[in-house]
Amino acid sequence: VEWTDAERGAILSLWGKIDPDELGPALLARXXLVYXXTQRYFASFGDL
């Protein structure tokens, strides 16, 4: 994929607004609930 400078700027701007410490746990929980089979990849996390 080749990105234009405008596309790169838009992507960097969006990623700059994301707080991984806030969203990470919520996204992992959502992935484990919607795609229950993914829990096997996170067995070390305990019962999600």
Curated annotation (Swiss-Prot):
Q: How does it assemble?
A: Heterotetramer of two alpha chains and two beta chains.
Q: What does this protein do?
A: Involved in oxygen transport from gills to the various peripheral tissues.
Put simply, this protein is called Hemoglobin subunit beta-B
Keyword Transport on this protein? yes
Misc: This fish has ten hemoglobins, 8 of which are anodal and 2 cathodal. The cathodal tetramers do not exhibit the Bohr effect, due to lack of the C-terminal His in the beta chains and to blocking of the alpha-amino group on the N-terminal residue of the alpha chains. The possession of both anodal and cathodal hemoglobins may be a physiological advantage for fish living in fast-moving water habitats. This fish possesses 6 types of hemoglobin chains, including a major alpha chain, a minor alpha chain, two major beta chains, and two minor beta chains.
Gene Ontology MF term list: heme binding; metal ion binding; oxygen binding; oxygen carrier activity
Homology family? Belongs to the globin family.
UniProt entry tagged with the keyword Transmembrane helix: no
Gene name tied to this protein: hbbb
What taxonomic ancestry is recorded? Eukaryota, Metazoa, Chordata, Craniata, Vertebrata
Q: Which InterPro entries does the UniProt entry name for this protein?
A: Globin, Globin-like_sf, Globin/Proto
Query: What are the residue boundaries of the Globin domain, all occurrences included?
Result: 2-48
Please give the positions of the paired cysteines in each disulfide bond: none
Q: As annotated in Swiss-Prot or TrEMBL, what is the tissue specificity of this protein? A: Red blood cells.
**Keyword tags:** Heme, Iron, Metal-binding, Oxygen transport, Transport
